[in-house]
Design a protein with these regions (language model features):
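PRPP-dependent phosphoribosyltransferase catalytic core
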Residues: 2-17, 140, 145-223
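Short secondary-structure boundary/capping segments
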Residues: 15, 28-29, 113-115, 166
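Portal/gating segments that form or line small-molecule/metal binding sites
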Residues: 80
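Active-site-facing substrate-recognition patch
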Residues: 1-68
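Structural motif
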Residues: 71, 121-123, 151
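Short glycine-rich phosphate-binding loop at a beta-alpha junction
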Residues: 67-76, 153
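Short, glycine/charge-rich flexible loops or terminal/linker lids adjacent to PRPP-binding catalytic cores
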Residues: 83-126, 131-137
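Short helix-loop-beta connector
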Residues: 65-70, 117-119
Length: 223
């Protein structure tokens, strides 16, 4: 197995993520009224390219090393592939934490599977963080089995467009490959998003258009 260099950051990672096929979908999405963000991201598409996934893992491994992490823990489900890549890049044991409220086997299966996390410093890995509700719940699940979450590593940090951020997610050291607004900027710069649509989208997000704002009609809806 070829050793992975985790010593130097890859400055092109944000662009590679933003331009991953299918990650940014042209058009707007208003899943529940005026909820932002307006551009849905299919972040699992960043995992399709093995070279990109390996480099994402290297960035996470650098962060894990800085924090003195004992175990890398992937958040079910979208954080698991990225956490595995971080584990492989850094040579750090891997585990994953079940999604709180998982139905079907909650009485038969432990909340954390894989490496033992009791008494360990762990890095929580997920695809994104926005309001931080998921981070709080996963952190509580890990604390319940004796683990200490010392940091969070995500593909995309979306806290800048969240209406509010949970105190737990705000306080934990967090590193991301890119941010939501940077993804949109890079997607527009590389021809994935129409520049006019992009400008309207950013305005909608930053200025929080109301539900009855007529400019919504100017934004094509995502399929």
């Amino acid at each position: 197995m070829t050793a992975i260099d985790i010593t130097a950051p890859d400055q092109s990672l944000a662009t590679r993520v933003a331009t991953a096929p299918g990650l940014v979908r042209a058009g707007a999405s208003r899943w529940d009224g005026g909820r932002t963000p307006v551009h849905p991201l299919s972040m699992e598409n960043a995992y399709a390219d093995p070279a990109l996934l390996q480099d994402l893992g290297a960035q996470g491994a650098r962060f894990a090393r800085e924090l003195g992490v004992d175990v890398v823990v992937g958040a079910e489900t979208a954080g698991v592939p990225l956490a595995a890549a971080v584990s492989l890049a850094g040579g750090v044991p891997f585990a994953f934490v079940r999604k709180p409220g998982y139905k079907g086997h909650e009485h038969d299966e432990p909340p954390v599977r894989g490496a033992d996390v009791a008494g360990k410093r762990v890095l929580l890995v997920d695809d994104a963080v926005a309001s931080g509700t998921a981070v709080e719940r996963f952190t509580a699940s890990l604390a319940g089995v004796g683990a200490e979450v010392v940091g969070v590593f995500v593909l995309v940090d979306m806290r800048e467009v969240a209406e509010s951020v949970n105190p737990v997610a705000a306080a934990l050291p967090t590193e991301s490959v890119t941010t939501y607004l940077e993804v949109l900027d890079l997607a527009a710069a590389n021809g994935i998003l129409d520049t006019t649509v992009h400008e309207l989208s950013i305005d909608a997000i930053v200025n929080r258009w109301t539900e009855d704002d007529p400019r919504w009609e100017l934004l094509p809806m995502a399929a």
